[in-house]
Amino acid sequence: MKQLNYQNVILKLNEYVEDVDGWSPYYIFDIGAYSINEPVGRIVFRCGSDMEHEFAGHIGYSVDEPYRGHHYAYQACKALEEFILSLGYDHVLITCSPNNIASKKTIEKLGAEFVETKPIPSDLRKEFTVSETHKRIYYWQLQKETK
């Protein structure tokens, strides 16, 4: 796999999960920052259709609290973009809870288009935390990097 990096971030594949209880395959990457010798968070890419990932999104990320505010989630998404394109995707869905202002800003900085806010269906509620009742859904049109 080609090295995945963007600006101050490098991604390292932590795990590829091919099939778990009927879920689509997914990749888990550690987010590393060049200036720090330990992971600052994680980013996940979930293979599959828009319908499968309408509420969880194709991409999920978390940045550890001490490292927040440095745009690492944004940079990790950008580092992942070419890899996702290489898998045959031209767009992905990214979601966040309506009250997650940091994620909303990250997603909007990527240029993703807001689609709608929807309540999480009751049959999917077990996959989310108790406080997650709705999701803001965004469509991110991927761009091949021009050199």
Predicted segments, located by residue:
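Acyl-donor (CoA/ACP) binding surface of acyl/acetyltransferases
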Residues: 1-7, 12-17, 23-147
